[in-house]
Amino acid sequence: MIRPIRNLLRRQALRRDRSTAPTSLLPMSAVRSAVVFVDGTAEGEDPAVAARLAQRLFADRGIDVQVLCPAKRDLDWLGRLNAAQGSPAGVDLFLSLAASPDCFAAAYAAACSTARFKAGRCTLPDGIYDLVVASPRQEGTDSQAEAFTAILEYLDKIQ
């Protein structure tokens, strides 16, 4: 009984809180700040590996990065990030490493982000992402670190 109510409230929250900021593809040379969402609830994987990789590679490029890596305790009843963990305003790139469209925290963070360019690993309803880099293998088989490296290669090709 709780699940349908929660899903209804999630849809309402997405509709109410969704960002209306325009988004488009940006070359990496135009990116000055980024937010990387690492799925802290992914099973069988250490999210710290992807978080460290994202911090290191963006720092090497001179891009300010904030890594969001929420555990279950960092989410509210609906599955949204707690206010203290929220995505900052005014970022250029939002990158989600969540492999499943069922990860509501990633979908909500992406939808509400005011980033000028959004990229992710799976297609979400309403076309939230400007760029989707899906694994050629079965969904979710790549680690988040492997997915980050692959997405970064695509981002480097955008002129």
Question: Where in this protein do the model-derived segments appear?
Answer:
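Active-site-proximal region of nucleotide-activated glycan assembly enzymes
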Residues: D126-Q159
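Active-site and donor-binding regions of nucleotide-sugar-utilizing enzymes
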Residues: K72-E139
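Soluble or luminal CAZymes and related metallo-dependent hydrolases
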Residues: V49, P101, S143
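Short N-terminal or domain-adjacent regulatory/targeting segments
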Residues: M1-A34
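Residues at the starts of beta-strands that form the adenosine-phosphate
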Residues: R32-S33, D64, F117
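A short beta-strand-loop structural module common to alpha/beta enzyme folds
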Residues: D64-R73
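Histidine-anchored nucleotide/phosphate-binding helix
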Residues: L25-L26, V35-I63
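Conserved beta-strand segments of the P-loop GTPase G domain that flank and frequently precede/overlap
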Residues: V36-D39, L68, S96-L97
